[in-house]
Amino acid sequence: MNLEIRRDSINWHVKINDLKEIMSSLQREGNYWEGQVFLTKRKKEYNLSFRIFLNSNDEDEFDVTDGQLILSISDDTFSLLEEYTVMVSEYGTPFAHELNNLYFISLKKWLGCHIYVEND
């Protein structure tokens, strides 16, 4: 997996099996999945909320057939992710970060993120 930061979006490349594991750990809320980003700092654990929205063409499912789905994150979360790599945890936590500093994050405006699904 790798994370590519653009001016107004994040491109996240992930293997399809890892994506399935992430999606199965998320909680369905209306027309989006909601979960937590787990942050670790000197043996302390923090978390941030995030949402994966469904495909706008069909609110009953998200689209991975063309190799991507849309993830939306807040402005502050976007700024935080610019400096750190996102990795899938093997033990149930969707994302893990090693942080030098922890910033207060308030969920405000949402930015777009494309997740490109790699078949292998």
Short names for language-model regions:
Residues 1-120:
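Positively charged, low-complexity terminal tracts
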